[in-house]
Design a protein with these regions (language model features):
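His/Asp/Glu-enriched, well-ordered alpha-helical/loop segment
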Residues: 171-191, 195-200, 245, 267, ...
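Gly-rich Lys/Arg/Thr-decorated short loops/hinges at beta-loop-alpha junctions or inter-strand turns
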Residues: 25-29, 50-58, 166-177
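Alpha-helical scaffold segments that flank or form the walls of functional sites
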Residues: 18, 35-87, 92-109, 128-142, ...
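Histidine-rich, glycine-flanked metal-binding segment
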Residues: 1-21
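Divalent metal-coordination and catalytic microenvironments
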Residues: 17, 28, 48, 52, ...
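A conserved acidic, glycine/proline-rich C-terminal tail/linker
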Residues: 364-370
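Histidine/acidic residue-rich metal-binding segments in metalloenzymes
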Residues: 95-273
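Histidine-centered catalytic micro-motifs
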Residues: 23-34, 148-152, 208, 275
Length: 370
């Protein structure tokens, strides 16, 4: 409780003229895809904390049961992470659905499926699998607040589009965009929204990237449906001069889609801003091999907050009060860690970020420690 007596800290920071924000929550990261989880956990959470991100949601992925690895993952997070973590588990097999109650008892209540997979990493799941998973989630205790993240792209459309591009030039971000068309995301978002409504399961649409997705969500937004976009989609488009460094899944989109995402933030359609952080070194990215062979994804934790504030405040002319809840309070509420996280209240964790909106700096990757 607040009292008249406040003890003096060991260090006093003069925050005059600065914004004091709750620690930023990035609900969407991937760690341990190319190297062991513990190795990336140490480097990327170090970069996160330097960028003002104090809590991350990380999507774990493996075949078979998660039960044998939960204790190891918990131990690695405790020993190596500089930030707190919200665990999400990607599900791909019936055994994992059967074990949901056991995962829930271990504190894993956030799950994920891919309507369109990532070759070599994540298989796609058929609609029947998703419905069966939702049915099982409804049997979990309501106090667990289970939630299902869905990667929304129509896998058949993406497969055909990718096949068509095999005989076409694939040199630019616009070319890469054509392998995963906007249509594929718009259609899949409509399905996910319908499933969430009919099944009564809290559903989180990850990394929304297109105008078509915004139109679909605006037509069927309901209390069980939450919408995420990411800082790369808000700050970059197919006209950005970054070449294969910008290769992602889903792709960075055309300027019209980027505008639609900012309109979604203005209207309140979008609930959260994450990163979809994926760690690749320059060598692993293989940019020199061209767009077709380059790896998808790149690390963004260290520049996430400053990118959103720079673009949102100075180019989109939005107040900071409009942006901060999408990176603090909203993800905290959605993933069940509010009010411990996402706000500055008596009893909340003292995760604080000081922001100087007057400072101008050029991004240098060396201090980011990723």
């Amino acid at each position: 409780a607040l009292t008249a007596e406040v003890s003096r800290g060991r260090r006093v920071i003069d925050a005059s003229g600065l914004y004091v924000l709750p620690g930023i929550i990035d609900p969407h990261t991937h760690l341990g895809l190319a190297v062991p989880f513990g190795q990336e956990l140490e480097s990327e959470t170090r970069s996160a904390i330097l960028g003002g991100v104090t809590t991350i949601g990380t999507y774990f992925n493996q075949p078979g049961s998660y039960l044998p690895v939960i204790d190891r993952l918990r131990r690695e997070v405790s020993q190596l992470s500089r930030v707190d973590m919200i665990p999400h588990s990607a599900l791909r097999e019936q055994q994992q659905i059967d074990e949901l109650p056991l995962y829930s008892r271990q504190g894993m209540n956030s799950f994920k499926v891919y309507m369109c997979g990532v070759p070599g990493l994540y298989p796609h799941q058929e609609d029947g699998f998703i419905i069966r998973l939702m049915q099982r989630m409804k049997q979990l205790p309501p106090t667990a607040h289970p939630i299902l993240s869905i990667h929304c792209e129509n896998t058949s459309i993406c497969d055909y589009a990718t096949e068509d591009m095999q005989s076409q030039p694939l040199d630019t971000l616009a070319d890469w965009n054509r392998t995963h068309p906007n249509l594929a995301e718009g259609e899949a978002v409509r399905r996910a929204a319908y499933f969430a409504r009919e099944m009564g399961v809290r559903t989180y649409v990850v990394h929304s990237s297109t105008r078509e997705a915004m139109e679909a969500l605006a037509a069927d937004k309901h209390p069980n449906l939450y919408v995420e976009t990411t800082s790369p989609y808000l700050c970059l488009d197919t006209d950005s001069p970054i070449g294969a460094y910008g290769k992602m899944l889903p792709p960075i989109r055309e300027p019209e889609s980027r505008k639609a995402l900012w309109d979604g933030i203005r209207s309140g359609l979008i609930d959260t801003i994450g990163t979809d952080n994926t760690v690749l070194t320059a060598g692993e990215k293989q940019v020199s091999s061209g767009m077709r062979e380059a790896g998808a994804g790149y690390p963004t934790l260290g520049t996430h907050l400053v990118s959103v504030l720079d673009e949102g405040i100075y180019r989109q002319e939005l107040p900071i009060e409009k942006l901060v809840p999408l990176m603090t309070m909203n993800p905290a509420r959605i993933f069940g860690v509010y009010p411990r996280k996402g706000t500055i209240l008596p009893g909340s964790d003292a995760d604080l970020v000081l922001v100087d909106l007057r400072a101008a700096r050029t991004v240098d990757p060396r201090p980011l420690l990723s």
